[in-house]
Design a protein with these regions (language model features):
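Asp-box/BNR beta-propeller blade signature and adjacent active/binding-site loops
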Residues: 5-229
Length: 229
């Protein structure tokens, strides 16, 4: 049998002393499309059987927000054997006159609405903060100038194109919290059609908490459930 290592053919030899294991397929590598690193992946299968991988595009380095970071998506229609060119699903460029490196968006989570096949991505957008780490520099409040913003995008064509960002911060954030963001990875659709994403936040006492946010109207409005520490 044959495999590929660094895009070069390689022969797999089995000596009978161990189980044969499949070689992984590298979807994104450091340096691809000029990015220093790709981190924080999530993976879903759409109703059409398409695989969608979501991740941070970390252009300058592998460090966390605040930095020059966008949300990327890779798409496969052959069960992961090959992947289409990367799509940028969420970017804030030079919003507010600040450089791209002070408009990072990252740590995505992805969800397939199994009733409609609409795909949702949620991520945290940080504006300003002087390239300090968002975990310590996001402050209480509601505006982008003071606190990280919780943003959604959606796709209604099986992950080919993505909407403009939708800001749901006013729907779900307590103004006293320092930082509200999603739980990276993926969300779920419950049997009754409720859409659920994991979330995390730093409260007014700077204690990290965990919870979920949910939508019962196909993603039009979002709410937080009982929170847990």
């Amino acid at each position: 049998p044959m495999a590929e290592i660094n895009n070069m053919p390689a022969t797999i030899v089995w000596d009978g002393k161990s189980d044969v294991r499949r070689m992984g397929i590298g979807v994104r590598h450091a340096g691809d499309d000029g990015a220093s690193a790709y981190r924080i992946p999530g993976l879903v299968t759409t109703n059409n059987g398409t695989l969608l991988g979501v991740y941070d595009i970390r252009y300058n380095s592998s460090v966390d927000l605040q930095e020059m970071v966008d949300i990327g998506v890779s798409r496969s229609t052959d069960k992961g054997q090959t992947w289409e060119p990367m799509r940028v699903a969420m970017t804030f460029g030079e919003t507010g006159g600040l450089p791209h490196a002070q408009n990072g968006v990252g740590d995505p989570s992805i969800l397939v609405d199994e009733k409609t096949n609409t795909i949702w991505i949620v991520a945290a957008w940080t504006h300003g903060m002087g390239n300090g780490r968002a975990w310590w520099n996001s402050m209480p409040g509601m505006s982008a100038d003071s606190t990280a913003q919780l943003m959604l995008v959606k796709s209604e064509d099986d992950g080919k194109t993505w909407s403009q960002p939708i800001n749901i911060t006013p729907q779900v954030k307590d103004p006293s919290w320092y930082f509200l963001l999603q739980g990276p990875g993926r969300g779920i659709t419950m049997k009754d059609g409720t859409l659920v994403f994991p979330i995390q936040f730093i409260d007014s006492t700077r204690i990290p908490n965990a919870g979920i946010m949910y939508s019962k109207d196909r993603g039009t409005t979002w709410h937080l459930h009982n929170l847990a520490r």
